[in-house]
């Protein structure tokens, strides 16, 4: 205890910031110094589920006790800087209380706000207080569940990270209004709930944006229905983000569409899992991508003609085989990626019918004769098309160093599995250094 007491205030505050707020306040009992030391901690976390009545058996959290604790904690820090406020609230929370707490934090120079509702039955008036939308110091805003109602007057000039999980929106334009008010935003994460069946109109014109993620709610099964497949989607995407490095879009709603891609020329890593009528407008805008993961379902894919090597920087390609269009897409990407080094083929989702037909390229793609080194094939089933593709790669990839296969049948016919692996082992390989691995 003596050794801790001799630490500098800055170091001691850093140590205390890793504790929960209740534990931090209890340190006041340790010594006279700690009575004021906790006031220097720039981070406060409050969870109403930890405030239970002192009775046996299951009880709802004592919200009155929790509210008094938060009030006391915030008001006792008058004049002190509060950098981070984390509120984890249940169904008993009051909008008026949230407005007061966030308002106090804004006046104390709030830099990071995390607000999470643990219950789907959040208050109807659960929108954020107006003072937050003009907070000049706010850098990080993370919201989970709740209701977003963005006022006309909004300016978040310092906000760099915005995370919205399972949110409901007051109208179609409120999200656009919020994004337009964040001139230095660098990271945007949006996760839609399975209960949200409407499409979001996305117009993202953010010169500083570096990372963009749009995902459905984490998969849950209800009566055999995968709700992540029917969550809301993106409609009419407009994207102008010249600083964007990482792009991750998962939208299987069938609502996905692209209106205009102005500039995403800096993207180096991208994941696209979308059901769309014409996904190539987005795909072929990724001119600088080095690593791409694709699961595309399209009624029609029109591959650009006359562009030459569209993906001249692409080093790693990952393709999902669940959609019937995957093989045609894969061959086109081989032809358009002269520097490709690594390939991963995987069945990430249930297979759709009909299955693709193998059409050998008219000429050998340049990457097969100059750069492709590794192949990883997960969920290899030994179908006719898969055999044709693997044989073609073995015969043409002169730089192959390693090809690994994981069989689809983990508990199926052992003889069929053995025969499938033997066929792969006996396939002629043009590369003398190619190592064949079976997992």
From Swiss-Prot:
<dbReference type="Pfam" id="PF24758">
    <property type="entry name" value="LRR_At5g56370"/>
</dbReference>
<feature type="domain" description="FBD">
    <location>
        <begin position="358"/>
        <end position="406"/>
    </location>
</feature>
<dbReference type="InterPro" id="IPR036047">
    <property type="entry name" value="F-box-like_dom_sf"/>
</dbReference>
<dbReference type="InterPro" id="IPR050232">
    <property type="entry name" value="FBL13/AtMIF1-like"/>
</dbReference>
<protein>
    <recommendedName>
        <fullName>FBD-associated F-box protein At5g56380</fullName>
    </recommendedName>
</protein>
<feature type="domain" description="F-box">
    <location>
        <begin position="1"/>
        <end position="61"/>
    </location>
</feature>
<dbReference type="InterPro" id="IPR055411">
    <property type="entry name" value="LRR_FXL15/At3g58940/PEG3-like"/>
</dbReference>
<dbReference type="Pfam" id="PF08387">
    <property type="entry name" value="FBD"/>
</dbReference>
<dbReference type="InterPro" id="IPR001810">
    <property type="entry name" value="F-box_dom"/>
</dbReference>
<dbReference type="InterPro" id="IPR006566">
    <property type="entry name" value="FBD"/>
</dbReference>
<dbReference type="Pfam" id="PF00646">
    <property type="entry name" value="F-box"/>
</dbReference>
<dbReference type="InterPro" id="IPR032675">
    <property type="entry name" value="LRR_dom_sf"/>
</dbReference>
